[in-house]
């Protein structure tokens, strides 16, 4: 294998000089992975533009070996952190793409363990992938997401084709025939949630009782024996969602709390109907003083599910007992 596989590759160019390119790389072998990934990285390196890679360690080694000395010009991130949780990846990508690079295109290759967290996590990854097409539509960036068809479920591969406008293989791009516009995908793939357990602890609130809800949530968090930072994150997320319910959900609601051996849950229900197809997925404007609650919660929680139900709008926050959100880069 040559020390620098970029040297022999010609740059076929990028369609358009601005805007997002979002493609899925579906592969079944190490060679198919390299044949699809290397052209992406080489284009960025040849142009002297930023290249970021967040893939599992064994894939990163393949890329480093293939790139040779040029791998030093690639920013390699630990995928176990960068791609651990959909909301955290969304926040990290937002921070990375928003940096001022004087119009240079940004190149990103990412691969998470898309199926590893169970069906609910896999579905959330797919919703996040779909929303990227809206959230970063104006970003001058080429984002390629790799999927190992040899180990992933057929449903996950089908979702990849539905949430990425393009497919790439061997350095060649094609339109994904299965692609669904984000609003259509969101409508067809809402979160599926079981009802809270009958023994969930519940507290009602309105604008006059926000302080008591926060104190009640603090007491509940203390009983969970969380670390100080972890408990603080939980309380921030609960506060944001309860405040959001008061301001936008009819002025009142009910919060339910329960736990499992792996996770803690808070579900906030308030009157109303969900009207936004991408609640909390779109990055707020830098100067936006309000409307950040759901976005912040997605950066803190391991999962945030929002749905319209018979009781109104339900926002369910899931916190891992062990995982904590990484500090912003």
Q: Which residues does each predicted region cover?
A:
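Short glycine/serine/threonine/alanine-rich loop segments
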Residues: 49, 141, 226, 251, ...
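Conserved beta-strand-loop-beta-strand hairpin that lines the nucleotide-binding pocket
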Residues: 191-196, 243-329
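Short glycine-rich, polar/acidic loop-and-turn segments at beta strand-coil junctions
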Residues: 55-58, 238-240, 259, 270
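Conserved short strand/loop->alpha-helix "switch" segment adjacent to the catalytic nucleotide/phosphoryl-transfer site
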Residues: 207, 211-240
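Amphipathic alpha-helical segments that form the core helices of the histone-fold
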Residues: 42, 238-243
């Amino acid at each position: 294998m040559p020390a620098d596989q970029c040297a022999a590759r010609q740059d076929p160019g990028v369609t358009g000089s601005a805007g997002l390119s979002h493609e899925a790389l579906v592969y079944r072998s190490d060679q198919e992975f390299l044949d699809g990934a290397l052209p992406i990285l080489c284009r960025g390196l040849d142009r002297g533009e930023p290249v970021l890679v967040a893939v599992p360690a064994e894939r990163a080694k393949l890329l480093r070996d293939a790139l040779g000395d040029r791998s030093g010009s690639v920013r390699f991130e630990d995928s176990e952190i960068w791609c651990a949780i959909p909301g955290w990846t969304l926040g990290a990508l937002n921070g990375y793409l928003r940096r001022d690079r004087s119009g240079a295109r940004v190149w990103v290759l990412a691969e998470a363990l898309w199926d590893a967290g169970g069906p609910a996590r896999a579905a959330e990854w797919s919703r996040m992938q779909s929303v990227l097409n809206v959230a970063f539509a104006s970003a001058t960036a080429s984002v390629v997401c790799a999927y190992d068809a040899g180990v992933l479920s057929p449903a996950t591969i089908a979702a990849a084709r539905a949430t990425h406008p393009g497919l790439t293989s061997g350095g060649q791009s094609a339109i994904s025939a299965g692609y669904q516009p984000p609003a259509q995908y969101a409508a067809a793939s809402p979160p599926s949630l079981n009802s809270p357990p009958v023994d969930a602890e519940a507290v009602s609130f309105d604008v006059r009782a926000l302080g008591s809800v926060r104190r009640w949530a603090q007491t509940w968090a203390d009983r969970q024996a969380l670390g100080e930072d972890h408990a603080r994150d939980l309380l921030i997320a609960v506060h944001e969602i309860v405040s959001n319910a008061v301001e936008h959900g009819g002025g009142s609601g009910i919060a339910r709390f329960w736990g499992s051996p792996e996770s803690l849950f808070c579900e906030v229900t308030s009157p109303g109907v969900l009207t936004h197809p991408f609640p909390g997925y779109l990055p707020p404007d830098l100067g936006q003083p309000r409307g950040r609650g759901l976005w912040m919660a997605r950066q803190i929680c391991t999962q945030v599910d929002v749905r319209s139900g018979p009781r109104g709008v339900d926002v369910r926050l899931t916190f891992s007992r062990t995982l904590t959100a990484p500090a912003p880069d």
